[in-house]
Amino acid sequence: MISVTELRNGTKVEMDGGLWECLDYSHLKMGRGGAKVVTKFRNMETGSIVDRTFNSGEKLQDIYVEGKKMQYLYKDGADFMFMDMDTFEQVILPPSLVGDAAKFMKENTEVEVAMYGEKALTITLPNQVILKIVETDPGVRGDTVSGGTKPAKLETGAVVQVPLFVEQDTNVKVDTRTGQYLSRA
């Protein structure tokens, strides 16, 4: 058990039958009354965000979330197949859990999966990945002064804006957090 006054950003707790991560907290001291803790939590299963106010003496059940290294193997219909790098077990994860990470995952990409017991909660990609451009317009010679960009389709199906000089079949480095082109690889 953890007191609500010990909550910090990133603290993970179990309350109301769900798993929650603390996004924000503030300690408010009232003039005559007791102190209150105003928090913002994100449900780790559904992604919904709620604001909660607690009295300073309340306690919550803290949980331990383990980060496991996994490797993306392939897509099976709608589901994604991953392999645990320690035990070599294969794990099936639904598209609702993978979410936007699928845009930057190609086969053999290593990811970190937050696990609570045997339940997968979230996927964290590496900050940068190297992907191949499969489709883009050819660059126009001499059109480099404007510093313009053009759309390019990557091997995973994602579309990113790249500089005009980048051509098809070029490997590029992409930031997975923002989806922006970083450099040629």
Curated annotation (Swiss-Prot):
Subcellular location: Cytoplasm
Any one GO cellular component localisation term in the record: cytoplasm
Pathway: Protein biosynthesis; polypeptide chain elongation
InterPro entries assigned: Elong-fact-P_C, NA-bd_OB-fold, Rib_uL2_dom2, Transl_elong_fac_P/YeiP, Transl_elong_KOW-like, Transl_elong_P/YeiP_cen, Transl_elong_P/YeiP_CS, Transl_elongation_fac_P
Superkingdom, natural source: Bacteria
Keywords of the record: Cytoplasm, Elongation factor, Protein biosynthesis
Molecular function (Gene Ontology), one example: translation elongation factor activity
Spans through the membrane: none
Keyword Protein biosynthesis: yes
Swiss-Prot/TrEMBL GO biological process terms: peptide biosynthetic process
KW GTP-binding (keyword) present: no
Function: Involved in peptide bond synthesis. Stimulates efficient translation and peptide-bond synthesis on native or reconstituted 70S ribosomes in vitro. Probably functions indirectly by altering the affinity of the ribosome for aminoacyl-tRNA, thus increasing their reactivity as acceptors for peptidyl transferase.
Similarity comment text for this entry: Belongs to the elongation factor P family.
Protein name: Elongation factor P
Gene: efp
